């Protein structure tokens, strides 16, 4: 998937794009495993050593607030994220 699709998704939901936000959205759009914030951080950190866990958590919160991604709460300790916001079974 090209970064352009992630950028377009951010623009569609009126989220100001940044390098980190585009990378996080791109990861979500490419991985259908409903990753946690830690999984996303661990996947992106080797390519983006300036990325912090706080940035990942804050970015995911913005995505959820704006409706760009879906929050899937398994229990109090396991929040997962899904870029597919159309109704579907989990």
Where are these regions (language model features)?
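Short, Lys/Arg-enriched N-terminal segment that forms or immediately precedes the first helix
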Residues: 2-14
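Short helix-capping/hinge SLiMs at alpha-helix to coil transitions
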Residues: 15, 29-32, 46-47
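Pre-recognition alpha-helix immediately N-terminal to the DNA-recognition helix
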Residues: 22-27, 39
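A short acidic, leucine-rich amphipathic alpha-helix
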Residues: 39-45
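Non-DNA-binding regulatory cores of transcription-related proteins
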Residues: 65-90
């Amino acid at each position: 998937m090209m970064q352009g699709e992630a950028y377009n998704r951010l623009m569609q939901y009126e989220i100001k794009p940044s390098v980190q936000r585009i990378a996080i959205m791109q990861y979500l759009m490419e991985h259908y495993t409903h990753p946690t914030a830690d999984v996303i951080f661990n996947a992106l950190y080797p390519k983006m050593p300036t990325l912090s866990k706080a940035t990942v958590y804050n970015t995911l919160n913005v995505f959820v607030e704006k409706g760009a991604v879906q929050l899937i709460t398994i229990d109090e300790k396991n929040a997962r994220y899904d870029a597919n916001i159309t109704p579907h079974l989990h």
